[in-house]
Every structure is written in structure tokens, then in C-alpha cells.
């Protein structure tokens, strides 16, 4: 089920994310799950813990909803900036559609006319490549990562379906660039003459220069694609709640990650109720009974995973102090009252 190595039956895995903190070779950590399960809170908290043991950590949101700013109470954008109160933890929020428009406009004034003529054709061609929005988001990430040196990068990904596309796009973009290169070889001279008649591409570039840049991007993506499939460098943390649909999504996600050869060996189960044995809340007890059923299923299905059980908290986890308290429970298991 997991691409991580199986452990002996008598070896009970810790119910924490300590193994991720201890694995110093990790460079890419993805955090994903169904919407509304506490994915952003978990990714922020994991990044906080990593900042204690790594020289530099970058937290990136690829979710169009962008909740990092809300979680930390600080505005982030497409440029990496330090999180208040930290000297080695930075964050950024990437808008995939904006990244795509930036690429098409190439920063030139003529970009405003890109909806017409050849520009419109190129835009249609670009958007016809499956997963191209995530691919452009990834290209934006690569630009940042290449210009700034971070020891480990944590991705707060979009809800499940988009996450899996996000992990596919290195391959998708490689194929798309190969097709564009083939088109260039066939129609390059004709396209260059048409471009020349229209004043060329924005920024004064010719088609060959654009394709050369894209080929360079393809090589970088190919290298990162190989890193994604290396369990020493990359892992995926699944986040869920103890309900049927969330568990179903988690199982589907783990199966797909395994098919992509991406390591996953940790699950964070959020929003758990732990009513005390003297509790008079019948609704709490009923919900706990339901949650326990799914927790038992998780324990049976994922015996070779680190499964972290996190309580439902009274207040929202927002701001540095609350995130730090939440993050402590990722490495020091929550001790519930006696049931």
C-alpha cells in the first residue's frame, strides 16, 4: 500500500511525524487531503517543527484558496517572505492561473493583446495541455527554488483531486513541451515569419529563444520529477478525519501516490473527540463511537504508517502561538482523558 519499506510486525510505528523530522535527506514534503480536514493547519505546523531542526524551510501553498495568510495572520504572495517570529521559515502563495498569464504575457506591454491573432492561438495551445495550470504553478516554484536556497520545501496542496494532478505535471509538462518542440521543428520558419510580420513576441524574443527557455525548463522539471520518486528526498503526508468519505479519499490518494512511485508513510487524523468517561454529552459519545470505528479501520489498513491522532480543539488554530501548540502534538502524542 505504501511505497515505504514494510516494517516487522512486532515493530509498532510511532504515532507521530518524528520520523520525517529525523530524515535529514528529505527535500520535498507534500501535505494533502480532502477539503476541510485541517490540511493547511497540519502543513503550517509541520513546517514549524521542521524549522527547529533544519537551516531553512519554505512553505508553499498551491491551493487557489490560499489559507497560509489566514493561518499565520500575515499576508503572503508569490514571492517568498519570512514568517513573523521566525528567521528560517519562509512562506509563499502561488496562483496557478496568474502564473500562466504571466508566462503568456512575458511581462511585455504587448501581453495585453495576447487574446488576438497568434497570441490567442498560443494561449489556446498552452491551455489545451492537461494540467497546465498546475504545471505553471510548478514552474513558478522552480524559479523560486533555483534562485533561493532552501533545505526543505513543504507544499500545502490543493484538495485531493488537484493534488494528484499537481504531482503528475512534471510528466505532463515534459510531454507538452516535447509536442511544442515537434511543432516548432515542423512549422518554425513559418511561425517566425508570421511573428516577424506582427512585430515579434513580447519582449523582443523570437520563437527559438522561447523554445530554448522551455527546453531548459523541461530539463529542470525532468530532474525534479526524478527527485519526487526518490523516497530519500520526497514524501507525502496524508491528512484526513475519521469519517467514511475522508477515509475513502485517503485510500484512493495513497493508491495513486503508490502508482506514481511517490513515498507516503504518514497519516494525520484530525478533529477527533475524546469525551471523558463521566461526560454527559450523548452526541459526543455517539460521534466518538463512529470515529473509533474508522480509527480501527485506519489501524488495520495502514499498519505500516505513522498514524497521528489529533484532537478537535475548542478554538480555531490561527496565529503563531496556537500553531506552535498544535505542532507540538505532531511529535508528542496527545494524551486524551480516560474514556
Swiss-Prot record:
Keyword Cytoplasm: yes
GO terms under biological process: tail-anchored membrane protein insertion into ER membrane
Coiled coil: none
GO molecular function annotation: ATP binding; ATP hydrolysis activity; metal ion binding
Primary location recorded for the protein, binned into one broad class: cytoplasm
Entry EC no(s): 3.6.-.-
Residues holding Zn(2+): 281, 284
Keywords tagged on the record: ATP-binding, Cytoplasm, Endoplasmic reticulum, Hydrolase, Metal-binding, Nucleotide-binding, Transport, Zinc
Active site: 63
Compartment annotation: Cytoplasm; Endoplasmic reticulum
GO cellular component: GET complex
Quaternary structure (record): Homodimer.
Family: Belongs to the arsA ATPase family.
PANTHER family: ARSENICAL PUMP-DRIVING ATPASE ARSENITE-TRANSLOCATING ATPASE (PTHR10803), ATPASE GET3 (PTHR10803:SF3)
Protein name stated in the entry: ATPase GET3
Species assigned in the record: Coccidioides immitis (strain RS) (Valley fever fungus)
